[in-house]
């Protein structure tokens, strides 16, 4: 019964299996394989090869892009490092210039204070000399006045004694 079912499935239920049909079917299968190879398999393999090349190209490009990005990142880091160093140098330079200016301003202020002090001393000395001269003049005037009074008194006493 199994044999009959298998034969019926193959389409040969009423007849026996013919050798010519098998050869014809085998020949058609080989032709089908050849046609599939030429028109389907080869183009499919070409597409697969192109896809593989495309993926390899993308992978290579991605790898190159990654390397370039890493290189640019390293360059940026180096530039940032240089910028920080330059900024630090500018800050240090500005600090030293500020210190120099501070010292110059302090020195200038000290010199100005010394000049003002010397001018004040000279002014005090001049006023002292003027006061001394005025005092001498006043003492001389008073001395003359006192002397004239004393002389006048002596003269009047002598005049009185003589009279």
From Swiss-Prot:
Predominant localisation class = membrane
Record CDD domains: ATP-synt_Fo_b
Instruction: Name the propeptide positions.
Output: 1-11
Q: Which residues cross the membrane?
A: 16-36
Per UniProt, the keywords (alphabetical) are: ATP synthesis, Cell membrane, CF(0), Hydrogen ion transport, Ion transport, Membrane, Transmembrane, Transmembrane helix, Transport
Please provide, alphabetically and separated by semicolons, the GO molecular function terms listed in this UniProt record. proton-transporting ATP synthase activity, rotational mechanism; proton-transporting ATPase activity, rotational mechanism
GO cellular component terms given for this protein = plasma membrane; proton-transporting ATP synthase complex
Q: Which family does it belong to?
A: Belongs to the ATPase B chain family.
Q: Where in the cell is it found?
A: Cell membrane
Protein's job: F(1)F(0) ATP synthase produces ATP from ADP in the presence of a proton or sodium gradient. F-type ATPases consist of two structural domains, F(1) containing the extramembraneous catalytic core and F(0) containing the membrane proton channel, linked together by a central stalk and a peripheral stalk. During catalysis, ATP synthesis in the catalytic domain of F(1) is coupled via a rotary mechanism of the central stalk subunits to proton translocation.
- Share what the entry says about its subunit structure, partners included: F-type ATPases have 2 components, F(1) - the catalytic core - and F(0) - the membrane proton channel. F(1) has five subunits: alpha(3), beta(3), gamma(1), delta(1), epsilon(1). F(0) has three main subunits: a(1), b(2) and c(10-14). The alpha and beta chains form an alternating ring which encloses part of the gamma chain. F(1) is attached to F(0) by a central stalk formed by the gamma and epsilon chains, while a peripheral stalk is formed by the delta and b chains.
- The protein's name is ATP synthase subunit b
Q: Which InterPro entries match?
A: ATP_synth_B-like_membr_sf, ATP_synth_b/b'su_bac/chlpt, ATP_synth_F0_bsu_bac, ATP_synthase_B_chain
Please indicate if the UniProt record lists Ribonucleoprotein as a keyword: no
